[in-house]
Amino acid sequence: DQEIKNCDCLIARLPSSISTMAVKSAKKNNKPYLIEAVACPWDALWNYNLVGKILAPFSYFRMKYYLLNSRYTIYVTNEFLQRRYPTRGKSVNCSNVALKEFNDKVIEARLKKIKNTQQDSKIIIGTTAAVDVRYKGQQYVIKALGKLKKQGLTNFEYQLVGGGDTAYLKSIAKKNNVADQVKFLGSMPHNKVFEWLDVIDIYVQPSRQEGLPRALIEAMSRGLPAFGARTAGIPELLESQYIFSNTVRNIDEICSILKRFDKRCMTEQALRNYQESKKYDKQLIEKRRQEFMLEFKEYSKYYGDIG
C-alpha cells in the first residue's frame, strides 16, 4: 500500500493476484492506473483442476469488474478479451508478441518445401509448450493420430518441443498405439526453435488457455500452415476452418483438419499465415503502445484535477 501511495501512477497486468491488490490500492489512494489484460483467468483456472473450477467464477467476475471500471486498458487480443472483459474507458489492442524482422526468403523456402512434398511422405506436426501441463492440449492431437491410424493414415509424426515430465503424454501415445509417431524433443533455445519450425510441416496450438499465443504467431511467420483450438486469441489468427472446438468432438475435428491439408491447401495457408503474422511487426505494435502510453501519461499528470 505504501508503494502505491508513493507512486505517480500504476501499470498493472491482469490476471495476477499482486496486480489486483495494486489496482485496489490505487483506487483507494486515488492514483491513476492503466491495466494490461494479458489472459483470461476463467480459462486458466477452469481447465486446471477441481479447485480451479471453484475459483474460476470468482476470478472471472473480479477481472470483469476491474476492467469495466478501468479508464485506460491495453488488450493483447484483437477481440476475445475485449468481448469477455469489456471496459467503459479508453482501450487499445497491443499484442505482447512482437516479431523483429521478416524475410521473404523464408516463405519462398516454405513454398518450395511444400511443392517438393511427395505423395504419402511423412508429415511432421509440431507444438511448442510445456509437456506436463494438461491444458496445453497435446493429448488431443495424440488421440487424433490414434484415430487416423485406425483409418489407415500413419504418415503423421507429432514432434513436441518443451520441458516437463513426459509420462502422461507418453501413456496417451501408448494407449492410442502411436508411441512411434510421437517424438519428445525437450526444451530448446529460442533460435533453435526457429530452425525446427523450418523443418516441420504443420503447426498446431491445441491449448485450452491462452492470451495471444506467441508460439503460433512465430510459426506463422515461418510460413507454416497451422491449426488450433477455439481458445482465447487463437481464432483471431487462423481461418475458421482450421479451428477445432473444445468439446468431445475435438478429436474428430482434428482428424478432419489434418486430412484437409493437401498441397494446394498447405500452399494457400503458408502464404496467408505469413502475411497475417506481419501484423505483429515490432515497430507497428510499439508505435501503437507508445501513443497510448503517452496519452495515459498526460492523463496522469492532471488526474488530481479530473479524477
Spans of features found by a protein language model:
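Short alpha-helical donor nucleotide-sugar binding micro-motif in glycosyltransferases
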Residues: 4, 187-188, 195-200
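A short, active-site helix/loop in glycosyltransferases that binds the activated sugar's phosphate group
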Residues: 44, 60-111
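Conserved donor-binding/catalytic core segment of Leloir-type glycosyltransferases
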Residues: 111-136, 142-145
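Glycosyltransferase donor-sugar binding loop
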Residues: 128-133, 156-170, 186-187
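Nucleotide-activated donor-binding/catalytic signature segment of Leloir-type glycosyltransferases, i.e.
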Residues: 170-188
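Aromatic "clamp/platform" in nucleotide-sugar-dependent glycosyltransferases that forms part
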Residues: 206-208
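Short hydrophobic beta-strand element within catalytic cores of glycosyltransferases
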Residues: 216, 225-228
